């Protein structure tokens, strides 16, 4: 089910106080969610951690690491009830804009082969699959590979 929003969502800096909401979203949409420690470490390290909110409601978020003329999108997530409503596309565009402002020449990300919807989104926004990381993700049984996608920003 998609929720229709009348006003535009806002991109905000993620803060420690957001982590309970972020973890609630993670636990619903992922079989192997990030931990509080993963998010807290990202905040402490100064990564670009953003939330996507409408009227105070958390719609999604991302974690972006930019360094040495490259950026790596570590996590981009949309709350289950807001998926397939354009929020993933909007968040990805925001992440690309931030990576450009950080002087990144390229942006990389990993995605599970089983996450076909995300792969379609990345391809539509100009990302190309460039590699496979074997056994990258934990899975119910064993490990799952990751497809590596990249986009040139300059």
Give residue spans per PLM region.
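Short glycine/proline-centered loop/turn elements that form peptide/ligand docking sites
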Residues: 92, 115-118, 135-140
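Conserved catalytic-core motifs of GNAT/GCN5-like acyltransferases
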Residues: 110, 123, 128-145
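ABC family nucleotide-binding domain
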Residues: 83, 87, 115, 121-125, ...
